[in-house]
């Protein structure tokens, strides 16, 4: 569905992406992880058609998103930004309903609001919500948009969509993204919580600081201390919980603390 091939991009002569190659498939949630400045958000902007690579291609169902009209993009791609940018004078239900005009009061919107624990806040002004609640409302809007898309090409891009959420709501949000993927969408999500990425994403792409894909594949196989330590420059301790899930904890060496 989403295929990136040999993506190169630089700003003011400084390379940001160097030959990034990966894919995000229908029915799967793909985590995009890496240190700050590795080019994760830049890749999402290319996928949105906002930026064009200097070299290489990124296509969605064979189409270059930069060459699509705004209505065509909206019918294929939903986006969750790092920070909410909607007008604060609207209610939660109105914000979510923007994704499907005329369906603001539909059962679809109500269902998504309930899944993200926003059903009791749907009448509140978006601007009165906490940062985590605003993230949930913004995510709800994108999911409603995906469900309303008319064609078979459905892609959801999310840039750190759970960074302000508490653990319970972050897990609920990731589970809903997984359900959205299972309904025929390709989901590509930037995450800094590596344990969440390993446990709740199907696949993972690891970007190094130099904008090179260091590893890509099933999340459980890719997100390991051996792969992550040289990328992030810290040691990771892996522990297995009673349920069998692996938890990754970064450990900063005492010799590096000033």
Where are these predicted regions, by residue range?
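The feature captures the beta-strand-to-loop junction immediately N-terminal to the Walker
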Residues: 33-35
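Helix-to-loop junction immediately C-terminal to a conserved catalytic motif
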Residues: 48
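Conserved ABC transporter NBD signature motif
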Residues: 56-64
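ABC ATPase NBD coupling module
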Residues: 64-78
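Conserved ABC ATPase "signature" region
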Residues: 106-121, 143
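Catalytic Walker B motif of ABC-type/P-loop ATPase nucleotide-binding domains
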Residues: 156-160
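Conserved switch/coupling elements of ABC/ABC-like ATPase nucleotide-binding domains
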Residues: 209-221
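ABC ATPase nucleotide-binding domains
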Residues: 225, 229-258
């Amino acid at each position: 569905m989403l295929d990136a091939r040999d993506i190169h991009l630089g700003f003011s002569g400084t390379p940001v992406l160097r030959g990034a190659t990966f894919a995000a498939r229908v029915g799967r949630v793909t985590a995009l992880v890496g240190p700050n400045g590795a080019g994760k958000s830049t890749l999402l902007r290319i996928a949105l058609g906002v930026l064009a690579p200097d070299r290489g291609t990124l296509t969605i169902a064979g189409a270059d998103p930069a060459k699509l009209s705004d209505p065509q993009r909206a019918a294929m791609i939903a986006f969750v930004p790092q920070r909410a940018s909607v007008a604060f004078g609207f209610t939660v239900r109105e914000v979510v309903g923007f994704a499907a005009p005329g369906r603001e009061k539909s059962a679809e919107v109500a269902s998504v609001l309930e899944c993200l624990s926003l059903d009791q806040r749907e009448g509140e002004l978006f601007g009165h919500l906490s940062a985590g609640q605003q993230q949930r409302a913004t995510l709800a809007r994108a999911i409603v948009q995906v469900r309303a898309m008319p064609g078979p090409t459905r892609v959801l891009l999310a840039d750190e969509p759970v960074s302000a959420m508490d653990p319970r709501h972050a897990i609920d949000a990731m589970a809903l993204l997984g359900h959205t993927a299972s309904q025929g969408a390709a989901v590509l999500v930037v995450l800094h919580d590596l344990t969440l990425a390993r446990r709740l994403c199907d696949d993972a792409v690891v970007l190094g600081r130099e904008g090179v894909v260091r590893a890509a594949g099933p999340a459980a196989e890719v997100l390991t201390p051996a792969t992550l330590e040289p990328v992030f420059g810290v040691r990771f301790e892996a522990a297995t919980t009673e349920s069998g899930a692996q938890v990754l904890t970064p450990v900063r060496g005492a010799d590096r603390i000033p």
